[in-house]
Amino acid sequence: MKRILYVLALLILTNGIWAQKTIIEEIRKDKNISGGGYYAYPYPEHPLPSLTPAPKGYKPFYISHYGRHGSRWLHDAKQYKLPVESLTKADRYGKLTPRGREVLAQLRQIQEESKGRIGELTPLGARQHEGIAQRMTKNFPEVFRGKGLIDCKSSVVMRCALSMLNEVKVFQAFNPRLHVKADASQSDMWYMVYGNEKANELERQARDNELAAYRRNHMHLDHFLHALFTDTKFAQDSLDIQNFTGNMSAIISNQQSHDTDVSFWDLFDEQELLDNWLCDNAFWYVARSSSPISKGYMPHLAENLLRNIIESADKAIADGTCQANLRFGHDACLMPLVSLMNLGDYGAIIDDLEDLPERNWWLHRIIPMGGNLQLIFYRKKKSDDILVKALLCENEVTFPIPSDLAPYYHWSDVRDYYLKMLTP
């Protein structure tokens, strides 16, 4: 019996080590993955996902979508300001390495360029959405034919509206006869961008407790500090090291949002690259997914959105006037939606944050900059059977129900499953 338990324990440990090796291997291939939620949308720079052909006779006729805005500037000016102040202080005392002085000069330039741009969409972010729309029209041209309606709605935040407009111009160029509506109204935010104080309080509690403990266990700063400071004790004693490293992590991770050759990934060794990813990954699982730490509450933030998706699809199927409902918002809305729908098992309940990597709960595959969910609806002549396929960041993902045609599912089954789940 003891031998069996030992073997089981060894298998569990080995699986955990294997999972971390897997994500390390991913990061070795592309250090930008370390940025987690800052990860720039990977296509077309990476090989495009292959799509399973539809069953014989079925053609796409409708798309329902929710997308995160594209790559952006950081959303708080302090994220640029505070690292400059910290490094300037260290420089006054002669405590910076040559690389540290170079980083300070680069950060001053970045801070200057950020003025008036905080939180705004970058040119790369605009191109990401152009590419997403172009592939949508290429993969599903039937949806964008004729004179039908493409109904686009956006968060009232400018970067989301601009993300929407960069897709709109692609649809209009593809087929000028389309009726493309684009709107950004506070009247739609009750389902487009929903949050409440309960979620905020659960997030605050987790930040102060479980997430703080997790970060302490995954904060290896030796290489990072030695790269910047000649006296790391000075840095730890004289600077607000937690705020400094947090803001530096944001800048380093978000450099990929810009068309620039300036990179700071060399400041991290391999363990620190992994830690950077692990901490962001854990944060998002707790803050907007199914974590027991946040009482499994966060997916419920997307209930209004899921109802809107179902009701909009019902209307499109019934009257045939709308060919696509496209919604443009934020990571904090897309994540709860994917978790609520449990697409690709991303709504899994995982008790231990250390198990996230081995369970393939990988943030950068869910909500990178420009991340999106596309539900593609299919039908065939002389049949009432509607099929639906889910694409998460253009990759086929499963619904949490059986299907004889996976990755295609009978819409009636999907609809019934989610309506029962939404019923109080």
Residue ranges and their predicted role:
Residues 20-151, 155-325, 329-424:
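Signature for phosphate-centric chemistry
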Residues 1-23:
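Bacterial Sec-dependent N-terminal signal peptides
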